Amino acid sequence: MATAMQDVSPSFTSSPTSTMTTISTTTAATAAAAPKPDKPRKLRSACDACHRSKTRCSGGNPCTRCHEYMSPCTYSYSSRCGKPKGARSRKTLEREQRVAAAAESARIAGNPSALASLPATSTCTSTATTAAAAAAATTTTTIATTTAPSQGPAVDSAAAAAAATTSTVASPRADDCLGLFDDDEESNPFFSSGSENTGGTSFSPDWIPPLPSISDSDLSFPLLESCLGPDHDCNDSLFWSTTAEPDCQPTSKEPLDPRSKLLRSCKCLQTLSSLTARDIRRFDATFVFVRNYARAFSAFYHCSHCPKDAGSISMAVTALQLATTALEKTATAGTDAAGFKSGCSGMTAADLDEDLLTPGAEFFLPANGRGASNPAFQLGSYQIAPLPGEPDLEEHSEILNILIRSAVRRLLAVCWQIWDLLRGPASRDGRGHVFEPYDPSSSSSSSSSSFSSGPEIHQLCDLSCSAEAAQFRSTLVQIPARLCNLLAL
């Protein structure tokens, strides 16, 4: 007897996995062989008459409605349509397979030693896929019982990698329906690090307003110190982003004088001209105006049909001055809101006409004197204002600071593009133009070139000696300085 026990005990304890597999297989076979008892069908809680008329039934036989109308009160069985409970569709299985494949690739990328076991991993993946399809058909759970204990940590790590991948892909600005931000701003050091001399704060996506990150064709303006310095890299992706040539054709094939027929020459000029005649009535419209102007000028800059003459560039500079003035008023609204509110009553109609805020404008001023440093701003359907009882909330100024920095970046990029257009014909890329009377050859320019070296402020004095160029030169020297002053507010 003792010998028999010694022979049986080792064989019983040596293969727990095979024993669990046998038990699971037997249980699954028994469950599959035994037919499931049909659940008793339930009667509707409403009678047939109330069900057809879609009215509330009081229940009973007869119900109140059938008793009132003296009609027969009968109850029928409810008919259930659709898939049975727990069934999964083909698209659900495909989505789960894609998630599992992404988790596996993330695990392999994070663990280089796993590359040696790639065939085994592929086998496990295909086995898991086949098992998932079988589970959807038979709704049994024998796969979970037959899984080896050593595969548990691998499955947990794959699930964790899938969760990390999903959280990484999610954008903190998925609801930026106004497109006030760019995709490259998050990785730009100009917005990702604070500046001591400008008083800027660190760029943190945790408190950014839920304003898609719509990728537009604006040029990315890099860090100011790196641009104006001698060691900047113009081939960096943060310096200029590649922009495709817009599909813009002239409305007429005959050569048009842009000075007399400006609006007939190109769609880009029409858009730019409409921006110069626009009146910015509200502070929150400033950021939208800057975005639209930067996009319109970028299309004009890269369009091969738009004439790059004095009239076109003068129109662009006018819109740039309008955007800069509006941005200055928006940036200083917090410090000057109290004085502006007290002085509105003494302003005349002429004063209001000269200001960007016209009498029909909706003034975005603080609700009380304590909130003078944090005026309310409305961006689309989002209201950015200090909470009641907390007028000195720092998040409001942080959000406004990020929006102002984004607008400054766009306008500085426009300044650099205008400088590129003002360069002489001896420039390295051939995009420069001389301000002479109308020259038909100036109506086309290369759209794929970009200047190879960043301009400096003192180089703006080397432009043409014409009156138009002198005026543009003085403006382009002043506007970047005004924009840089906004970063110190």
UniProtKB/Swiss-Prot annotation:
Q: What is its main location?
A: nucleus
**UniProt cross-references to InterPro entries, sorted A to Z:** OAF3 (IPR050675), Zn2-C6_fun-type_DNA-bd_sf (IPR036864), Zn2Cys6_DnaBD (IPR001138)
The segments labelled Disordered in the record are: 1-20, 188-207, 432-451
Per the record, its GO cellular-component terms are: nucleus
Quote the biased-composition stretches of kind Low complexity, using this chain's numbering: 9-20, 441-451
Q: Which Gene Ontology MF annotations are present?
A: DNA binding; DNA-binding transcription factor activity, RNA polymerase II-specific; zinc ion binding
Its GO biological process terms? mycotoxin biosynthetic process; positive regulation of gliotoxin biosynthetic process; regulation of secondary metabolite biosynthetic process
Q: Which UniProt keywords apply?
A: DNA-binding, Metal-binding, Nucleus, Transcription, Transcription regulation, Virulence, Zinc
Q: Kindly list the places in or outside the cell where this protein is found, as annotated in its UniProt entry.
A: Nucleus
Q: What induces it?
A: Expression is induced by gliotoxin. Expression is controlled by veA. Expression is controlled by brlA and abaA. Expression is also regulated by rsmA. Expression is also influenced by SfaD and GpgA.
CDD domains tied to this protein: GAL4
Q: Where is the composition biased (Polar residues)?
A: 189-203
| Superkingdom of origin organism | Eukaryota
Record note on disruption phenotype: Impairs the expression of the majority of genes in the gliotoxin cluster with the exception of gliT.
Q: Which residues bind DNA?
A: 47-73
Specify the protein name: C6 finger domain transcription factor gliZ
Name of the gene this protein is made from: gliZ
